[in-house]
Curated annotation (Swiss-Prot):
PANTHER family given in the database record: L-THREONINE 3-DEHYDROGENASE
Name of this chain's protein: L-threonine 3-dehydrogenase
InterPro entries assigned to the protein according to its UniProt record, in alphabetical order: ADH-like_C, ADH-like_N, ADH_Zn_CS, GroES-like_sf, L-Threonine_3-DHase, NAD(P)-bd_dom_sf, PKS_ER, Zn_alcohol_dh
Lineage, opening ranks: Bacteria, Pseudomonadati, Pseudomonadota, Alphaproteobacteria, Hyphomicrobiales
Listed GO CC annotations: cytoplasm
Organism, scientific name: Rhizobium etli (strain ATCC 51251 / DSM 11541 / JCM 21823 / NBRC 15573 / CFN 42)
Annotated binding of Zn(2+) 2, by residue: C97, C100, C103, C111
Length: 345
């Protein structure tokens, strides 16, 4: 194996990514080197491409980015015992310290010292990625490489949707991006009564309909209260999944929640994001922030959802070769795509 590989690198502090030859990551005693077969583009990667304020504050330059992937093990460290060369795997992109209170209590997703693959350390937009053995997730034979490559965002959706009991509940999802749609699918499959998803992007709304969401609302044209009445809802929503990061959508959600309703919040809010906190108080709402996946219960559940028949393939709207990565990022930046999966093989 050559000691060099091609990778997408944030090599300059400006808009874009660049394909370069970089050293293959070194494998420590407890590490696993994975030959990447498929990579998916995340919204985080778009922020890095755009070199926005968050990226400028967060991403060291140069950096191999990317964190959504699947592949097979190419090399294992001397102390690795659970995996073998050639095994099909994906990986958890949040690397935790294992020493803080939350880690030692089995709540690794709450680690204060989390490092992000492709954010704080070299990522998966390369021919190889190296992660600790503890972050490796084996992929069953009945799950394809491209579905495994989108398990990271699917895990965000599963973590968000399963934050609260859904059986018999009426659920509102604000934001029909890929994660919002997958969250709505999880809610529907988990026994929710009514599942309503809202957005203002026609392409995303069409994609939600294509994937079988029953009640798809264009918030720029339709009144949510009228939709609730039309589908037989006499009280507010029991559970809200906020995936948009848009203040108008979140405010509308708060207005439409039943007293005592529960809201899981994954959408990242911009500066100046304002809501009416008196409504939160007097409606006695329960708000929960979500970041990443619960390790590794969320992974177990998302694998089970797919093996149980949940078809995520329509959420992948673009399949491209890695050398055409610019086309993939253009599709993502347009807002008119679902997931974009890039083939390294």
């Amino acid at each position: 194996m050559s000691n060099m590989m091609k990778a997408l690198v944030k090599s300059k502090p400006e808009v874009g990514l660049w394909m370069e030859n970089v050293p293959v990551p070194e494998v420590g005693p407890n590490d696993v080197l994975i030959r990447v077969k498929k990579s998916a583009i995340c919204g985080t990667d778009v922020h890095i491409w755009n070199w926005d304020q968050w990226a400028q504050k967060t991403i060291p330059v140069p950096m191999v980015v990317g964190h959504e992937f699947s592949g097979e093990i190419a090399e294992i460290g001397s102390a690795v015992t659970r995996y073998h060369v050639g095994e099909r795997v994906s990986g958890e992109g949040h690397i935790v310290c294992g020493k803080c209170r939350n880690c030692r209590a089995g709540r690794g997703h709450l680690c204060r010292n989390t490092l992000g693959v492709g954010v704080n350390r070299p990522g998966s937009f390369g021919e190889f990625v190296c992660i600790p053995e503890s972050n490796v997730v084996p992929i069953p034979d009945d799950i394809s490489d491209e579905i495994a490559a989108i398990f990271d965002p699917f895990g965000n959706a599963v973590h968000t949707a399963l934050s609260f009991d859904l059986v018999g509940e009426d659920v509102l999802v604000t934001g029909a991006g890929p994660i919002g749609i997958m969250g709505a699918l999880v809610a529907k499959r988990s026994g929710a009564r009514k599942v309503v998803i809202t957005d203002i992007n026609p392409h995303r709304l069409d994609l939600a309909r294509k994937l079988g969401i029953d009640h798809v609302v264009d918030a720029s044209k339709e009144n949510l209260a009228d939709v609730m009445k039309a589908i037989g809802m006499t009280e507010g929503f029991d559970v809200g999944l906020e995936m948009s990061g848009a203040a108008p959508a979140f405010r509308d959600m708060i207005d439409k929640m039943n007293n005592g309703g529960k809201i899981a919040i994954l959408g990242i809010a911009p500066a100046g994001f304002e809501i009416d906190w008196n409504k939160v108080i007097f409606k006695m709402l329960n708000l929960k922030g979500i970041y990443g996946r619960e390790m590794f219960e969320t992974w177990y559940k998302m694998i089970a959802f797919v093996q149980g028949g949940l078809d995520l393939s329509p959420i992948i709207t673009h399949r491209i070769k890695i050398d055409d990565f610019r086309d993939g990022f253009e599709a993502m930046r347009s807002g008119n795509s679902g997931k974009v999966v890039m083939d390294w093989m």
